[in-house]
UniProtKB/Swiss-Prot annotation:
Signal peptide: none
Entry's EC annotation: 3.2.2.-
Domain of life: Bacteria
EC top class named in words: hydrolase
Family assignment from sequence similarity: Belongs to the DNA glycosylase MPG family.
Species of the source: Nitrosospira multiformis (strain ATCC 25196 / NCIMB 11849 / C 71)
Gene Ontology biological process terms from the UniProt entry: base-excision repair
SUPFAM superfamilies: FMT C-terminal domain-like
Transmembrane segments: none
Protein name, UniProt field: Putative 3-methyladenine DNA glycosylase
Keywords from the named record: DNA damage, DNA repair, Hydrolase
Length: 193
């Protein structure tokens, strides 16, 4: 069983960053919680937006690390990614779920529901609850409106295949906080890393 790192090095591989983010606290304009689920994507990964090279849509993924890359999924939901690896590489980590801890009333209002477990259990839900839209794309995540705090203590991390993709479906680059009820979906026969 591996534990998340005490600090997050965004110049590292997307897999390492995705694992390190589990247990970190993410606030956007003072609203957020603990990251409990992530997915890694890299330029040589056919499921990644960066696989075919830079485009107008994905240019931020090729920029410097530690920036937000926001895209709309299926033309409906915004999704938050953190860029990693050196500029020009094209890698990122999708924030799939957080455990809501701060600003719950704001999240409930934005999401139109009260069940805490459903407020941020999925990448579109995370963005809606935290008020994240395209305007945040390209912003540094180490300055306001973002506040990212690494976990204080190591946390148990599970891994398994990513969700909702049609290519490289079996690559085990989905990471989650072991036992969290706030995941977007349970891990099937997870590997504890």
């Amino acid at each position: 069983m591996s534990m998340s790192q005490p600090s997050i090095d965004f110049s590292a591989s997307s897999v390492d960053v995705a694992r390190s983010l589990i247990g970190a606290t993410l606030l956007v304009n003072g609203v957020g919680g603990r990251i409990v689920e992530t997915e890694a994507y890299d330029h040589d990964d056919p499921a990644s937006h960066s696989f075919s090279g830079p485009t107008r849509r994905n240019q931020v993924m090729f920029g410097p690390p530690c920036h937000a890359y926001i895209y709309r999924s299926y033309g409906i939901h915004w999704c938050l990614n953190f860029v990693c690896r050196p500029a020009g590489h094209g890698a990122g980590v999708l924030i799939r779920a957080i455990e809501p801890l701060v600003g719950l009333d704001i999240m409930r209002k934005r999401r139109g529901l009260s069940d805490e477990r459903l407020l941020c259990s999925g990448p579109g839900r995370v963005c809606e609850a935290l008020g994240i839209t395209q305007e945040y794309s390209g912003m540094s995540i180490d300055t306001p409106p973002f506040q990212l705090t690494p976990p204080l203590d190591p946390v148990p991390v599970v891994t398994g295949p990513r969700i909702g993709i049609s290519k490289a479906k079996d690559v085990p680059w989905r990471f989650g906080l072991a036992g969290s009820p706030f995941l977007s979906r349970p891990f099937r026969q997870p590997d504890i890393v």
